Amino acid sequence: MKKVIIMSLALLVAGAASVRAADVKENWEKSCSKCHGPDGKGKTKMGEKLRVKDYTEAKVQEELKDDKMTKAIKDGVKDGDKTKMKGFGDALSDDEIKALVKFIRDFKK
């Protein structure tokens, strides 16, 4: 009985912490697609101006590590003293950021 209760609680916590796919897509569209594009290719005015990477390219995906993406989403990206991308650590939870990293990985060809 004790095992059943523990497993039930574990499943409940895991379910509560998960981020729905619709929420991830909404976060991408709201916070990322203006520069990175809806398809992750970066073919937008801002994306081309900032020279963002094409997330559909296997080489880009290979070079870009999860921890680097997580840090960029959380803390932003600077080029010298200029901000290329604002951080979203105050607006997104760690689970939402982790889900965005997975979403970006899914752009790979």
Where are these regions (language model features)?
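Positively charged n-region of N-terminal signal peptides that target proteins for export
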Residues: 1-4
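Bacterial N-terminal signal peptides
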Residues: 8-15
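Sec/Tat signal peptide C-region and signal peptidase I cleavage site
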Residues: 15-21
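Short microdomains enriched in Cys/His and/or Lys/Arg
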Residues: 19, 54-64
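Cleaved targeting-peptide boundary
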Residues: 21-29
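Soluble non-cytosolic domains of exported or imported proteins
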Residues: 22, 63, 67, 91-95
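The canonical Cys-X-X-Cys-His
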Residues: 28-38, 100, 104
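Axial heme c-ligation environment in periplasmic c-type cytochrome domains
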Residues: 43-54, 58, 71-107
